[in-house]
Amino acid sequence: MKVVLMGTPDFVVPIFDEIARRHDVLAVFTRAPKPVGRKHIITKSPVHIWAESHGLPVYHKPSEYNFKPDMVFVAAYGAILRDNVLNSAPCVNLHPSLLPRYRGPSPIRTAIKNGDAESGVCLMKMTNELDAGDILMCKKFDIDIDDTNETVEEKVSKIGADMILEDMAAPEKFPPVPQSGKIVYTAKTGVYDEIIDWKKSPIEIHNLVRAFGAGRKKINGTDVKILKTKMNGDRLEIITIQPAGRRPMDWKSFVNGLHGTEVKFGE
């Protein structure tokens, strides 16, 4: 099968790799390189790097699309497809939630932050409307109490690869079904979402840290990132912390560095 791939982040790469092993990839569309970090180093997306390592042509602008594949497969591409793409071939999107719950750009982080114990992966037909296409297939998986964005992405990669290969092998087995149920949208996330409110419950703070990989706040007047936590019954334990301008350390080392000063969790 001739296929065009569209995607950007890390968790998409294993899925694209499985497709490329079995099918003819005509082109890969991904986010253009952009400045990253404090030094604003121009950085290619994980999918861009993967495509180049496999000698596959890489494109960034929808206006560059001029292909006639048997399928367009999309996963976390970050943009709604234009009609020239939608009309060129069947377009299938992998979305990491149980649609129509958590449409939009941050379904995994939102599920973890909300403390959901279950999520899923859906394959759907692409339309002009955001994540609103008919469903071809959905599979559920559990979100454990200590799962993070990264570990859930690993689950999505494995399940998603199996799903798209199954669909490509026998698409007639998966007729499209309209989405049903309550529609819930997610929003783009940023540094502001990582700010901890100490008035929240221990489990809510734990969920925030594992959703975003860091919780930001002041402790004893110092800006810190709380990188890892765990629940001990109803209590929250801080495992790894990173004071501003320093390397990550365990909580005990941080407290020892206060030399007996009382730990004060600031606003």
Predicted regions and their residues:
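N-terminal Rossmann-like dinucleotide-binding module
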Residues: M1-R38
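Short beta->alpha connector loops
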Residues: T8-F11, P62-E64, Y77-I80
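Generic beta-sheet signal
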Residues: V28-R31, A51, K61, L94, ...
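Internal anion-binding site segments
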Residues: S180-E267
